[in-house]
Amino acid sequence: MGLLVSSGGGDYESLKPGRYQAICYKIVDVGTRMESFKGGPEKKRTLVYLYWEVSHIQMGNDGEEFWDEITMSDGRPFSISKKYTASLNENATLHLDLKSWRGKPFTAEQLKSFDIENLLGKTCELEVIGYQKQDGSEGVAVESVYKPDGGVKNVSTINDKEAFDLDLYKQEFTGESNEDTKRMLDIYYDLPDWMKDLIDNSIEMKAVDTDSYVVDSKPNDSGGLSDLAKDDDENIPF
C-alpha cells in the first residue's frame, strides 16, 4: 500500500489521484517478519519501501495534456511511497514495477546483479489512485510506476537521497560500529515512528542484543541494501 510521507505527525497535504512525474529519493529496508496471506501458512517476508518526491502533475485542457509543476503550500515537494516484498521473482510486484519503470524486461544476468540503490535519483511517472481506509477516510496509493517520456534520467532531488540498509544498521549493535553504521543511525532517527517499529520488530533486529546500547542524543553526521530475495514462491500482489 502506498502512503504519504510527512516530516512530522498530524495533518498533512495529500496528493489527489492522477498521473505524476516523480524522482526516487529514499529506500528503506525494514527487515523480515513472518506473515500469512489470506489465511495461508506464515512465511518469511522482507519488506522494502521506495519513496518518491513528486514534481509535476498531468493536466488536460481542451483535449491537450501537459505537465504542471506541483508543490505543497509551503513550497516543499509532495512525497509518496510504496511498500514492496523484497523479491525479484517475475510475479513479485517489485519486479513488475521495475520492469514497467525501465520500459523493458530484465535479463537473467541483470537480475543477479541488480542493486536497488541505483534507483535513487531516477525519474519515473506514477499512477496514483484513491482508496478508502479502514477508518472510512480517504487515502491515496501508488498503483503503477512507468518509464517517463524521454526515458529514465538521473537527476538531483530536493530531499536528500538516502538508503537505509538494515544489515549496516545492525552492525552498530554488534561491535562493528563505523562511519557507515553511524550514517544508518542518522537515517533511522529521521524515520516516522511506525517505520522504526517495523525495523525494531524485524527478525533481524530481534536477533541482536540492543538492550546494552544507549544513545543519549542523535549521532552526529559522520553499503548497499541487502540482496533482494530470489524467492520463487513470492507472488503476493500489494
Stretches found by the model and what they are:
Residues 1-238:
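Short beta-rich binding modules
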